[in-house]
């Protein structure tokens, strides 16, 4: 076997293709697939992934996927309280995806993902959409086993964060106005 970095983009088939190249979802030999994964990392981090797909006759295959990352609990520290404020935050993100895939010929298949993305950290959150498009070509130049895959991932708008966590309280001791809240522009 000859492979290069990112080789799964050309060779993956079935449900695993939702992540690598959605064009491979319709190449599954089964009419329906399901997958669940839970991984635990260092420092209480965990990644969850679940997906299902099924063939819809001659129309191709559709799939639904969900992946989430839980960063774990983080003790909040500040310049004034470097040992912790007693507050705990739990950042995380999730992606909910809808997939369509179709084998056009015995060699060519196409696929697309439509993803809803949500990220949160403390009092700040962001949501957005992204698209993935892929093409898979099997037996390139009529060479058995030689495949070419092309995928464009994460096409979408800029994620813009919002929430109370983007404001900081500034106390000017010489002012009689009281506390002032300033927006943090660098966080968007």
Regions found by a protein language model. Give the residues of each.
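N-terminal periplasmic accessory domains that precede
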Residues: 16-27
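Outer-membrane beta-barrel porins/channels
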Residues: 1-12, 32, 39, 47, ...
